[in-house]
Each structure stands twice: as structure tokens, then as C-alpha cells.
């Protein structure tokens, strides 16, 4: 199947054979598992000091004193110590670094998940259901010439995105940016940001600098393409712009 290739003015200039990966069956279950596996591998193991709450000189006073038979400080006041329910005592079941906190996924399943997520970017209904505004997008998948990779100015990419019909989706991402509810706003996560278009290139020749300041826009080299880029939040069908060299590289990787 051949699709059109567009120039930076949004005009069709050529045609290209679509790789077989774009015809992979839709597997939202595998995509979800792959994204969660990617999430969990970034979690940092945490534990507690094995001696926390135990640095006390205590003794057991035994029975016959009308007091609970728990470890108590040797010196007055004879407060309870060491035990979990005492002030300054140890934790009952503290978190341990040995805990397995990551979710696994088989290599073939992860590969199939990425292929399925790539195919979802070419499905109009899936992209629309994800919330992207694609009324002015000429086709899916949207493939442009490699000249896009060399654009390094934000004002230039703004005009290009308008001509390609994806600027409306960038405006949507900008409008949805807001302050997070809860204490996360005090922990370096103040703003919630919507995901807009994804730009997949064969080689970065300056486009990262040209597109990074647009709200919701991400740029990735096709060799580093992961399922999280294509399905943020486990939701497949992200609006994606491909360059010709990225499509050729997809043919080499996935056929």
C-alpha cells in the first residue's frame, strides 16, 4: 500500500510504500502491559535502616509490676522502647530493597506491543478516540520529507505544523495544561501536561530544538522509539508525524 509524502508546505510531493508493521493487529492488552513494564523499571528500590528503632538500651522488667511486659528504657522515665507500637520503635514490616517491584514482559510480547502501537498511529478511529484533533490532518500516517529534521527554530516549526494540520492538536495540549491537585504540586510535579503530536525522525539534525518548546510535542529518533512514546498512559493512537528516513528505518527493523 502506497501513501503520500508531504513537503514542509503541506503539499503532496511523492509516494512511499507503507511498511508491513503498519498492518499489525491492534493489541491494546499487550500495549498496556508493555507500558506498565516500562514504568515499573524506573521505580527506585527503597528500604529502611535495619537498625532503625533498635538503638536503645532496654530491658524486660518481667511480670509482677502491674505494667505491660515490654522492653523498656533502663533509665527513667521507663518508657516502652524498641517494640513497634512504642515511640521511636522499629517498624513492623518495613519496605525492603529485595522486594520485586517491576513487572516483566516477554521480549516477543514487547516487540509485538511496539508494532501494534505503531500500527495504531495510522488508524483514524483510534487516534480520534484518544482525543487528538485531526480534522485538518491530510492523512494517517502523516509522512513528511526529511527536510523537517533540519528545522531548528521554533517559529519555523510553528508555521510548518500549521501547514501540516497538526497545530490544532498542539493548541489542545496547551489549553489542557493546568496545576495538579494534591501535594504533587509541591514535589516537582506542579503542572499536568497533555500529550500532543509525536515527531519520529531518522536522525536528529536540529528538529529537537525546533519542536521542544511546543506544548505536548515530543521528538524521538526511530531507533529509540518505545511503546511509551506511542501510547502515553497506556492509551494507544498518538498523533504521529513520520519522516521518510524514519519509515525506511522501520522497514529495516520490523519489515
Curated annotation (Swiss-Prot):
Recorded GO MF terms: rRNA binding; structural constituent of ribosome
GO biological process: translation
InterPro entries from the UniProt entry: Ribosomal_uL4 (IPR002136), Ribosomal_uL4_dom_sf (IPR023574), Ribosomal_uL4_euk/arc_CS (IPR013000), Ribosomal_uL4_euk/arch (IPR045240), Ribosomall_uL4-arc (IPR019970)
Annotated Pfam families: Ribosomal_L4
UniProtKB keywords: Ribonucleoprotein, Ribosomal protein, RNA-binding, rRNA-binding
Protein's UniProt keywords contain Transport: no
Entry's transmembrane regions: none
A single Gene Ontology CC term: ribosome
Keyword Heme in annotation: no
Entry superkingdom: Archaea
Subunit structure: Part of the 50S ribosomal subunit.
Stated role: One of the primary rRNA binding proteins, this protein initially binds near the 5'-end of the 23S rRNA. It is important during the early stages of 50S assembly. It makes multiple contacts with different domains of the 23S rRNA in the assembled 50S subunit and ribosome.
Family the entry assigns: Belongs to the universal ribosomal protein uL4 family.
Protein known as: Large ribosomal subunit protein uL4
Recorded name of the encoding gene: rpl4
Amino acid at each position: 500500500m502506497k501513501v503520500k509524502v508531504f513537503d514542509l508546505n503541506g503539499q503532496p510531493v511523492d509516494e512511499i510504500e507503507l511498511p508491513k508493521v503498519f498492518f499489525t493487529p491492534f493489541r491494546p492488552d499487550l500495549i498496556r502491559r508493555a507500558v506498565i513494564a516500562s514504568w515499573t523499571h524506573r521505580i527506585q528500590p527503597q528500604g529502611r535502616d535495619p537498625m532503625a528503632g533498635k538503638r536503645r538500651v532496654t530491658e524486660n522488667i518481667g511480670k509482677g509490676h502491674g505494667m505491660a511486659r515490654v522492653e523498656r528504657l533502663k533509665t527513667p522515665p521507663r518508657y516502652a522502647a524498641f517494640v513497634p507500637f512504642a515511640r521511636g520503635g522499629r517498624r513492623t514490616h518495613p519496605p525492603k530493597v529485595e522486594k520485586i517491584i517491576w513487572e516483566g514482559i516477554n521480549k516477543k510480547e514487547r516487540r509485538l506491543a511496539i508494532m501494534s502501537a505503531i500500527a495504531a498511529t495510522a488508524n483514524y478511529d483510534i487516534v480520534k478516540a484518544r482525543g487528538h484533533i485531526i480534522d485538518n490532518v491530510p492523512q494517517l500516517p502523516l509522512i513528511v520529507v526529511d527536510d523537517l529534521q533540519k528545522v531548528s527554530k521554533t517559529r519555523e516549526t510553528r508555521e510548518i505544523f500549521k501547514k501540516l494540520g497538526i497545530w490544532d492538536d498542539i493548541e489542545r495540549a496547551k489549553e489542557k495544561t493546568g496545576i495538579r491537585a494534591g501535594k504533587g504540586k509541591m514535589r516537582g510535579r506542579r503542572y499536568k501536561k497533555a500529550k500532543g503530536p509525536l515527531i519520529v525522525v531518522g536522525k536528529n539534525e536540529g528538529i529537537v530544538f525546533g519542536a521542544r518548546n511546543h506544548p505536548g510535542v515530543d521528538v524521538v529518533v526511530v531507533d529509540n522509539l518505545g511503546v511509551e512514546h506511542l501510547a502515553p498512559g497506556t492509551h494507544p493512537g498518538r498523533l504521529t508525524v513520520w519522516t521518510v528516513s524514519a519509515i525506511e528505518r522501520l522497514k529495516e527493523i520490523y519489515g
